Design a protein with these regions (language model features):
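Feature captures outer-membrane beta-barrel proteins of Gram-negative bacteria and organelles
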Residues: 376, 508, 636-644, 662-683, ...
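Acidic/His/Gly-enriched intrinsically disordered linker/tail segments
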Residues: 26-31, 101, 116-123, 131, ...
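A flexible loop/linker signature enriched in serine peptidases of the S9 family
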Residues: 183, 300, 318-326, 339-345, ...
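Beta/coil-rich, acidic/histidine-enriched accessory regions frequently appended to metallopeptidases
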Residues: 27-28, 35-38, 215-218, 242-353, ...
Length: 906
């Protein structure tokens, strides 16, 4: 009985928690032109665009070969097949496992931040672990819940599983079951290492987990990896299997862990960090004293990708908590802002007065169709220019003459290419396939027609040399485990960054003899090497507790210490994890899979019922509502939910009782075509009639009365969400057309005919605002403009048309991260020769005012001043953590004129 109460409490908490957004995530749709295949595998149904059979087979091969080994340290999931969808058109490399509906969504474009593990293997290992996690908890007391609420039961079952455990355990798995994984990278834990050894104070477990607006606290991926891995090292490989097995019997995850270990999660974090501190103190030696060019900051500020103009002037990308990314130029420690930039996804590259980089830009319409283009900043003209059309270009490298640009291009079909671009006009000159279809994550020119690239393939990470004059590839360096990145050519040698010795440092390779040497001895990490043009001074980004600083070393201060990249330093926990799993995807002999793809017809898979409930709640309302009163969201009734595999069709149907009346409600969204279609119908309550009569003075008046008809309200909306985001500006245009119908009948004044009330509402929305920094509450600058026109085509004797314009503007506040939002609106209703006012307003009422007033003309003014008050990072017990206290001061004014002969009123 007690467990049943806990289950009900979990379900209610789910409906009002942030987890609901993850539970019913709409991951976006692919271009309508895509045609799809499906491969039905033993444990997965793999759905992918036609033309990607080779890519899909690799995913099928890895998914099925990993599956038998994934349960060793977590337990077995439920037996139902898991849908997997590949999105090759998206450049924002990522993966996701969702609960309702159950699915794995994989963006197959490799990340330019990739380590020495191929992207498909990385995704399969990490996301497969999530499949097993959520599947494991669907046993025990949660198993019957599936029959009550469907696939959303997994969300309830996972409600008390902390995100650090889910993601940390998945990172542990990707590390243990391969030669790569983020757990093998020193930079993955660099934030904690720097704060413990070089920071002013250590933070609490709650602050590390929940984050801060005052300090940088890393990610729960790294925190979770450390905690889950330490627990496995100290308490055994099966500690999380045992803890989750007990959890599905008693609903207390931390209590289950404590049952086997005697430790709380806070104690686990404390013990983990004590262990790591002891390990890192053994390595805490720094034999170099570089010169710092960027100024020291009191708050976390980073300067990345330094490009020296000369030995005292450097251009870099600056990032901080209080502002968005920007280009800055630093001259002898004095910093000057150049311009704000967008979603940069590469290093900087400087040649002849121009600074180049690649940047992610969204597609016009589709979530899973976006691009990576080449841009540059012109130091003479002081502006940013877009060089290339919308393409899939990554990691630009510029030759010494500034005439050619070499880029990496992963195609939608899964082919990896090296592409040569003309630097002045951005047109493509040639494209070359990479040996073994290795993904090129970074490049540099090595003089003349020679290009050096860092490429990742199944065999590991390699340094390749390519001559585009004769088309010959040559392997310069091959390594299986140590990650290498950021190549630079200088005086016949290749310089790059690697964490081979347990700390990220700058290394060099002499192609003539194959000798690798370590050049720096950074305390926490040296990144982004580049060289001055005169004396060969090395510039790099040096990580410290308060962020990356730009440092430089003269040639005579470099180490030139011999190194072996084939024997990288062992990172904490890695050897233990690998021994526990006893499976390595990179070295295992893989068994072929039966791969027989069939056509996947979109029309036949429009609906996919995944969840239901013995009560009614509106998912959209629950996610958008801040209400604490559950009675406004949950009602007696029943709910049925559908979301198809391709995320093109989302439907919710329900029956509920409200105010004594039975209601049926249906909502349906289709986003598989260029316009998005949104339909909703609500059937229930009682409809009314409004008719004309005369009072005792002989005047025409209206009177309303309820009828025996059941009320029907329906709405159809079609809109086009055009995304025009550019640089740091979020931009778009959204034209829309809404048709509304209700069977409430209004009698026409002259003809005395009754008509259902209905209207059409064309509108258009323009928006343009600056991206928000982490500390921003409102955009710093920008606007939104909405123009609307409402007409009742079948009630023209009673009602005139309604026009409205609303302008929202954003302004900087008095202090950084304060924000001012001003909203101005005007509404006009055409009442000439009309009998009634429309029962519809397009302008929002003043806050706190709920009276339904009559209006011919209305002006509205609203002002909001949002400001942070305090960022205390306080924990109150184990349930409340306060990152920030903020205030919103507002003022509303509305002036209304009821008729042409009326006075204006406030």
């Amino acid at each position: 009985m007690l467990k049943s109460k806990y289950l009900f409490l979990s379900l209610i908490c789910l409906l009002t928690s942030f987890r609901l957004h993850a539970q019913f995530m709409d991951y976006g749709s692919d271009p309508a032109k895509f045609k799809w295949n499906i491969a039905r595998l033993p444990h997965y149904n793999l759905v992918y665009p036609q033309g990607n059979d080779s890519m899909a087979y690799r995913y099928a091969l890895f998914l099925e070969n990993v599956y038998p080994h994934m349960s060793k340290t977590i337990g077995k999931p439920i037996k139902a097949k898991f849908p997997v969808i590949l999105h090759p058109g998206n450049m924002q490399s990522n993966g996701m496992v969702s609960w309702a509906p159950r699915r794995m969504e994989l963006i197959t474009t490799p990340s330019s931040d990739l380590n020495n593990q191929s992207w498909d293997k990385h995704l399969v290992l990490h996301e497969s672990r999530h499949v097993f996690q959520t599947g494991k908890v669907m046993h025990g007391i949660f198993k019957p819940l599936y029959y009550i609420i469907g696939e959303q039961a997994a969300g309830v079952a996972s409600f008390f599983l902390p995100v650090w455990f889910l993601e940390g355990d998945a990172v542990s798995t990707e590390t243990a079951m391969s030669n790569g994984g983020r757990g093998r990278l020193p930079e993955f834990n660099m934030v904690y290492r720097a704060q413990m050894l070089g920071g002013k104070k250590n933070y609490s477990f709650d602050k590390w987990l929940m984050g801060s607006y005052k300090n940088y606290t890393g990610t729960y991926y790294a925190l979770g990896f450390d905690m889950t891995s330490y627990a496995r090292q100290r308490y055994g490989a099966d500690i999380w299997d045992k803890s989750t097995s007990r959890y599905i019997r008693n609903l207390l995850f931390e209590g289950s862990f404590k049952h086997y270990t005697g430790s709380s999660f806070k104690r686990l974090q404390h013990d983990t960090f004590d262990f790591l501190r002891a390990e890192w103190e053994k390595q805490d030696t720094c034999t170099q004293s570089p010169q710092y060019l960027s100024p020291a900051k009191e708050t976390y500020t980073s300067y990345r990708y330094p490009q020296p103009i000369n030995d005292s002037i450097v251009i870099a990308v600056k990032s901080e908590l209080k502002d968005i990314n920007s280009l800055v130029i630093i001259n002898n420690g004095r910093e000057k802002h150049l311009d704000y930039i967008g979603s940069i996804n590469s290093r900087l590259s400087y040649r002849h007065g121009r600074v180049y980089w690649s940047e992610l830009v969204p597609g016009l319409r589709w979530t899973h169709q976006n691009y990576s283009i080449i841009k540059y900043y012109d130091l003479d003209k002081k502006n940013i220019k877009t060089l290339t059309p919308r393409q899939r270009y990554l990691s630009p490298a510029i030759d010494e003459q500034g005439q050619h640009i070499a880029v990496s291009r992963p195609t939608v079909e899964g082919k990896n290419q090296l592409v040569l671009i003309q630097a002045e006009k951005g047109n493509e000159l040639a494209a070359f396939d990479v040996p073994d279809n290795a993904f090129i994550k970074e490049l540099t020119f090595a003089g003349g027609d020679t290009i050096i690239s860092i490429a990742v393939a199944d065999s590991g990470i390699r340094l390749l040399q390519f001559n585009f004059g004769n088309g010959i590839w040559k392997e310069l360096l091959k390594t299986a485990s140590a990650n290498i990145t950021s190549p630079v050519w200088k005086d016949g040698k290749i310089f790059f960054e690697s964490g081979a010795n347990g700390t990220n440092n700058i290394y060099s390779l002499n192609p003539a003899d194959g000798q690798v040497r370590r050049m720096t001895a950074a305390r926490f990490g040296a990144f982004d090497p580049s060289f001055g043009s005169s004396d060969g001074r090395l510039f790099f980004s040096d990580y410290q507790a308060d962020g990356y600083r730009i440092a430089s070393l003269p040639t005579d201060s470099m180490l030139f210490e011999k190194a072996d990249l084939n024997r990288p330093a062992s990172m904490p926990f890695v050897e233990t994890l690998a021994a526990q799993e006893q499976f390595n995807l990179d070295s295992a002999r893989l068994t072929s899979v039966d791969f027989n793809p069939k056509r996947y017809r979109k029309a036949e898979h429009t609906f996919k019922i995944h969840s239901w409930a013995p009560f009614y709640y509106d998912v959209a309302e629950a996610m958008n509502s801040g209400a604490s009163d559950l009675s406004t969201i949950v009602k007696p009734g029943a709910t049925l939910m559908s979301q198809n595999t391709l995320n093109t069709a989302i439907m919710q149907a329900g029956w509920y009782i409200d105010k004594g009346y039975h209601h049926g409600k249906l909502s349906f969204i289709y986003q598989g075509w260029f316009p998005v279609i949104n339909l909703s119908v609500d059937y229930g309550d009682k409809a009314f009639n409004v008719d004309w009569t005369q009072n005792d003075k002989g005047q025409d008046i209206t009177q309303g009365h309820y009828t025996q008809r059941n009320l029907v309200e329906a709405e159809a909306r079609v809109y086009l969400p055009f995304n025009l985001t550019h640089n740091q500006r979020i931009r778009g245009i959204q034209p829309a057309l809404t048709y509304y119908f209700t069977n409430n009948k209004y009698q026409e004044y002259h003809s005395r005919k009754f008509h259902n009330f209905q209207y059409i509402l064309p509108e258009i929305l323009f928006y343009d605002y600056r991206r928000k920094a982490q500390r921003d509450i409102l955009p710093r600058t920008g606007y939104q403009l909405r123009l609307q026109y409402l007409k009742t085509p079948f009630n023209s004797e009673n009602y005139g048309s309604l026009y409205a314009a609303r302008l929202t503007t954003y302004w900087p506040g008095i202090i950084r991260n304060h924000g001012l939002m001003i909203r101005v609106g005007y509404q006009y209703q055409d009442l000439d020769n009309k009998a009634l006012y429309l029962p519809k307003h397009l302008l929002e009422k003043p806050r706190g005012y709920h009276f339904q007033y009559q209006t011919r003309q209305q002006w509205a003014f609203k002002a909001d001043y949002a400001l942070p008050l305090l960022s205390p990072d306080w924990s109150i017990g184990s349930l409340i953590y306060i990152r920030r206290l903020r205030a919103n001061l507002f003022y509303d004014l509305s002036r209304n004129q009821a008729s042409s002969k009326s006075r204006w009123s406030n």
